[in-house]
């Protein structure tokens, strides 16, 4: 037998011994493996969560130069105007919106009116410019999977996720609820809507939004005052066209410019409006504020996850050291039948690698199962597209780091085992 063949046989024997040794200590083995798996899963979850939030928020709106709303924090304005998160504290008048729309620097505007919902999904009032100018991702246009945009007053266009979750089809009828979120509210039961279109999936908050016209938003509130129906006054749906349906207020507006060179001039003019307290925000600036906030949270979670992993590796060292006392005779017998100190070193390093490689794979499996369960909830509640499988370089490097940490951590106990004298395990203690 050649030297290479002999070495391979020897290594194969040691690998089999490592597996059998782990089987003989299965309780300690599995406890250590599960702790490594959980810490790996936690690290990967933080890493994937950071990327999922970044990707979802970044692709939600593109090609919009300014977001205009009532004066508040830039981040809050962007969150409720684009991502439907939170509630607006103030509105802007239609006259203020018209002043922005007529500005010589402005190419197009999209009015946005919020405040109603349907079974927990937000309702957005807008006009035809929304379907013509709104962009997401890599400046992609909204596409209708079925039907057409709203033409009649009580037409509604559904986002893909709304239609899928609630099972709506073209021609179905539904009623809206005053107020946002899952809290119970007063239904606009006297003015039902008909589904005229269903948008193709976008992976953005558009998917979980119902879209109606601004005229419709005004119509369902004709007999309302201070957030409640006026007692004794009922305006049937077939009579609303007799009224002026121009809105008095809207929530916000998305603005596109003829040339981006004028964005700061227009922003300054809007923020300095003398008739109304307005705020114009660059989406990129507001997103940077969000990234700074998330960066603090992410780094904290990463540090905690890394600490949990270090504790799991310390547990691995402790388990190997504790097993040395129980395995003195086993190791001595291996020496007696011809195992060299280097073989014992390799044996225990193999056990450490077995634990961390198994823990890394189990951790990734736990992450995948958790992602399958959490992805629909995250998309529905916060509009975050959570990838179920993601073979990105950062995750692969993290898995490799965990796998390599095992044999490195096991070197010290393995070295101690290899230095034990043959007589230590074969001489009975009195």
Regions found by a protein language model. Give the residues of each.
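N-terminal Sec/SRP start-transfer signal
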Residues: 1-44, 55, 349, 422, ...
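Transmembrane alpha-helical interface segments in multi-pass membrane proteins
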Residues: 308-311, 321-375, 405, 413
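Alpha-helical transmembrane segments of integral membrane proteins
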Residues: 31-42, 295-318, 352-363, 398, ...
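Short helix-to-coil transition segments within interhelical loops
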Residues: 22, 335-342, 420, 429-430
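Hydrophobic, regular-secondary-structure patches
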Residues: 41-132, 148-152, 242, 270-272, ...
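Short helix-loop junctions at transmembrane helix boundaries
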Residues: 361-401, 411-420, 424
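Mechanotransmission and gating elements of multispan inner-membrane complexes involved in transport
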Residues: 187-194, 198-298
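Hydrophobic secondary-structure segments that place a key small or acidic residue at a functional site
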Residues: 117-129, 137-231
């Amino acid at each position: 037998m050649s030297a290479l063949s002999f070495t391979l046989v020897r290594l194969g024997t040691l690998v089999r011994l490592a597996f059998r040794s782990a089987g003989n200590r299965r309780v300690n083995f599995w406890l250590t493996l599960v702790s490594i798996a959980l810490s790996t899963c936690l690290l990967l979850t933080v890493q994937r969560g950071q990327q999922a939030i970044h990707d979802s928020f970044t692709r939600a709106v593109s090609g919009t130069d300014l977001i205009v709303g009532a004066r508040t924090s830039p981040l809050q304005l962007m969150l409720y105007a684009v991502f439907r998160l939170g509630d607006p504290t103030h509105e802007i008048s239609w006259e203020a919106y018209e002043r922005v729309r007529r500005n010589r620097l402005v190419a197009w505007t999209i009015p946005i009116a919020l405040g109603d919902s349907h079974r927990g999904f937000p309702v957005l009032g807008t006009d035809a410019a929304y379907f013509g100018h709104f962009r997401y991702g890599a400046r992609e246009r909204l596409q209708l999977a079925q039907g057409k945009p709203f033409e009649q007053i009580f037409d509604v266009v559904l986002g893909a996720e709304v239609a899928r979750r609630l099972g709506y089809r073209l021609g179905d009828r539904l009623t809206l609820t005053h107020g946002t979120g899952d809290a119970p509210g007063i239904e606009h039961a006297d003015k039902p809507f008909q589904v005229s279109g269903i948008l193709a999936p976008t992976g953005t908050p558009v998917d979980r939004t119902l879209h109606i016209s601004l005229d419709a938003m005004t119509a369902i509130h004709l007999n309302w005052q201070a957030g409640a129906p006026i007692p004794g006054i009922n305006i049937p749906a077939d009579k609303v066209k007799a009224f002026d349906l121009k809105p008095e207020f809207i929530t916000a507006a998305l603005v596109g410019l003829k040339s981006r060179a004028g964005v700061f001039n227009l922003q300054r003019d809007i923020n300095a409006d003398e008739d109304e307290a307005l705020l114009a925000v660059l989406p990129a600036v507001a997103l940077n504020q969000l990234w700074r906030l998330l960066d603090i949270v992410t780094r904290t979670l990463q540090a905690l996850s890394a600490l949990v992993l270090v504790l799991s590796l310390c547990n691995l060292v402790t388990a190997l050291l504790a097993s040395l006392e129980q395995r003195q005779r086993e190791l001595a017998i291996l020496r007696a039948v011809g195992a060299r100190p280097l073989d014992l070193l390799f044996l225990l390093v193999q056990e450490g690698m077995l634990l961390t490689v198994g823990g890394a794979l189990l951790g990734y499996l736990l992450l995948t199962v958790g992602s399958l369960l959490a992805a629909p909830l995250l998309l529905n509640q916060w509009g975050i597209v959570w990838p179920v499988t993601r073979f990105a370089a950062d995750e692969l490097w993290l898995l490799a780091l965990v796998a390599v940490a095992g044999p490195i951590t096991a070197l010290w106990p393995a070295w101690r085992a290899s230095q034990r004298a043959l007589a230590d395990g074969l001489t009975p203690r009195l």
